[in-house]
Each structure stands twice: as structure tokens, then as C-alpha cells.
Regions:
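N-terminal flexible segment immediately upstream of the FAD-binding catalytic core
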Residues: 1-2, 17
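Rieske [2Fe-2S] iron-sulfur-binding domain
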Residues: 2-3, 9-10, 23-147
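Short Pro/Gly-enriched beta-strand edge/turn motifs at strand-loop
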Residues: 17-26, 92-100, 173-176, 237-241
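A short, structural micro-pattern
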Residues: 18, 110, 117-119, 252, ...
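C-terminal catalytic domain of Rieske-type non-heme iron oxygenases
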Residues: 53, 131-336
Length: 336
């Protein structure tokens, strides 16, 4: 009954969610072989056509439901591993080897494709009709910033739990005691919600963060602690962006992407933009953020099920203002 009251029953099957973009892979993950992904409970295959463009379609061959991701590519066309049926651009079946010359290809032999784009070094899918273009990040076109991508991981936790965590700062002294949260003030000032720009809604705050040796490449400081001016905001349904500005003028922008595989597992990746001098190796820059993400994963995988969205038994306090507003907007969206 609680799930029904809170709009979370069958969360990933909610039709409105299908009309948004979700990250499923890095662009570099898709080269000379097809790959298999799962989005909102749907199994899909992605491959690169002859011209390098991406094609995404239902994973099962319409003939005998063989997994097409186990096939291979010939001149940008996907060949089924079972009977050799071949699919070209737009998922159109162009060859059935067992058919005699002149026999037409059945209309049902073609694959059902889904929308796919490549942006920010990531592969994004939309299962329905995209509501809006993908958000723009000004740092991407600013030559003073560099972009650093990280691998796409699979977490055993609902995407809703991940977003709730990424919008929260009160867990820092506890979950992140091993990285930047040690000794951090536990009391959080009253926050005000605002549009941070045209695409993200959230709040601004300042913290004094621990700056251990392994964080110094990220912070650009040798001090034991550093002042951070930060923002955290969401873009519906499941994207979070955090920005960090240091006194030196260094800016560190993190895009946190949670993609529902099913009700209880998700893809996760984060992307960083920085206006540093580009001399520090990317792996060194992101090592600290990876460690922070691992602390989150360990905690989140202890939580069960989809995050309740509506009026629930969950107790909220003033520091939860951003996550409460995100849940309110998300519930309104999925029930629209």
C-alpha cells in the first residue's frame, strides 16, 4: 500500500520517464563491436554504423530472439549470431541469408529503434519522444575548461536513492569521513532554493572541507583544509550537477548521472569540467572524486527499493529541502 500511495510502484515502467534522455555508456565504449545495455527494464543493443553514427534498438532479433549484442559488424551493419540476419541503419533488416533471391523481407523483420545521441563523451538514449533537447553546459564550449569522463559503473541501488544522496550535504561528515568530510561541521544553515541557471534548480552553500594529500590535485591547494563555495542542483528526472569554486578561482564542475536499469539497479557515471592549467593528469584529478563516489556506493547499496516520493513515513528536516522539492517535482512528472 505504501508504494501505491507514494507513486513508486512500477517506477521504471512509468510512461513519462521514457521521454527523457539517460546515459548508458561512454562514447568510447562503442567501437567495432555492438554492446548490450538495459534501460528502464528494456534490453537494448547499440552499435556504430559505417559513418560512425550510433544506432540503438531492441536487443532481441525478431527471428528467434537471439541477443544481437553477441553478433558482429560488417561494414557498419549488425549481423545476428544465430542465423545471420543483417540490420543496417535505422535497424532495417537488409539481408536474410536463408531466403531465396527475390523473396521480400517481412516488415516485422526490422528492429524497433530508439533515439540515441552522443554528447559530453556519453551515449544517451530516449525510449519515447524526447520532451526537450538535452541541457547545455557552458563549460563544454569554454576553452579554459577541460572535460574528464569516467567509466560507467553498475550500482545495486535504485536511481532515486542516488539522486537523493547527491543532493544531500548532511551526510558529508559521516559517509565521507575518509575523504573530505572529516571534522566537518554537522549543522547546516537554512538553505534557499533557486534556479541556478536555466536548467538546474537547487541551492548554494559554503563549506570548509578536509584536504588530505590525495585531494590536493583536485583542490589545487596544499592546505590541510580548503574553503569551497558550492552549488547543488537537479535537472529532472535524475540528473544532478554540483559546482565547486575555490578561493584561487579554480572551478570544478561535476555532473552526476543516475540511470535506472530496473527498480533496484542503476548505471552511474560522473563527468568533470575544470578550468585548471591542464598539466595534472586526468586520472590524478579524478582519483579523489572516485573515492568519494565509492563511499556513496557502499552506503547506498545498503538501502532497499525505490526512494519513496510522496507523503511517506520518511521524516524530513530543513536541510532536506532540496531533496523534498526534487521528489515533489518527480512525483508530479511521473503522474502526469
Amino acid at each position: 500500500m505504501e508504494k501505491i500511495l507514494n507513486g513508486t510502484e512500477g517506477f521504471v515502467d512509468k510512461q513519462p520517464l521514457k521521454n527523457f534522455w539517460y546515459v548508458v555508456a561512454l562514447g568510447d565504449d562503442i567501437d567495432s563491436n555492438p554492446i548490450s545495455v538495459k534501460l528502464l527494464n528494456e534490453d537494448l543493443v547499440i552499435w556504430r554504423g559505417f559513418d560512425g553514427s550510433l544506432i540503438a534498438a531492441a536487443e532481441k532479433c525478431p527471428h528467434r530472439q537471439a541477443p544481437l549484442s553477441h553478433g558482429h559488424l560488417e561494414n557498419g551493419c549488425l549481423v545476428c549470431p544465430y542465423h545471420g540476419w543483417t540490420f543496417g541503419e535505422s535497424g532495417k533488416c537488409i539481408n536474410i541469408p536463408s531466403s531465396s533471391d527475390g523473396v521480400p523481407i517481412p516488415s516485422k523483420a526490422h528492429l524497433n529503434t530508439v533515439e540515441v545521441i552522443e554528447k559530453y563523451g556519453l551515449v544517451w538514449l530516449c525510449l519515447g519522444e524526447p520532451n526537450n533537447p538535452l541541457f547545455e553546459l557552458k563549460e563544454e564550449s569554454d576553452s579554459s575548461f577541460r572535460r574528464i569522463n569516467t567509466e560507467v559503473q553498475k550500482w545495486k541501488v535504485a536511481a532515486t536513492r542516488m539522486v537523493d544522496n547527491f543532493l544531500d550535504i548532511t551526510h558529508f561528515p559521516y559517509v565521507h569521513a575518509g575523504t573530505f568530510g572529516a571534522g566537518q561541521e554537522t549543522k547546516v544553515p537554512n538553505i534557499s532554493l533557486e534556479y541556478l541557471d536555466n536548467d538546474f534548480f537547487g541551492y548554494r552553500y559554503d563549506i570548509l572541507a578536509a584536504n588530505p594529500e590525495e585531494a590536493k590535485s583536485t583542490s589545487g591547494s596544499n592546505e590541510k583544509s580548503v574553503e569551497r563555495s558550492m552549488t547543488s542542483g537537479f535537472n529532472l528526472p535524475l540528473t544532478v550537477r554540483s559546482t565547486i569554486t575555490y578561493k584561487s578561482g579554480l572551478e570544478h564542475v561535476i555532473l552526476l548521472l543516475s540511470t535506472p536499469i530496473d527498480e533496484i539497479s542503476s548505471y552511474f557515471t560522473f563527468v568533470i569540467w575544470r578550468n585548471d592549467d591542464f598539466t595534472i593528469p586526468a586520472d590524478e584529478v579524478i582519483a579523489f572524486d572516485r573515492a568519494i563516489g565509492e563511499e556513496d556506493r557502499v552506503m547506498l547499496e545498503k538501502l532497499n527499493g525505490v526512494m519513496p516520493l510522496g507523503k511517506t513515513a520518511l521524516v524530513n528536516v530543513q536541510s532536506d529541502k532540496a531533496t523534498v522539492e526534487w521528489r515533489r517535482q518527480l512525483l508530479k512528472l511521473i503522474n502526469s
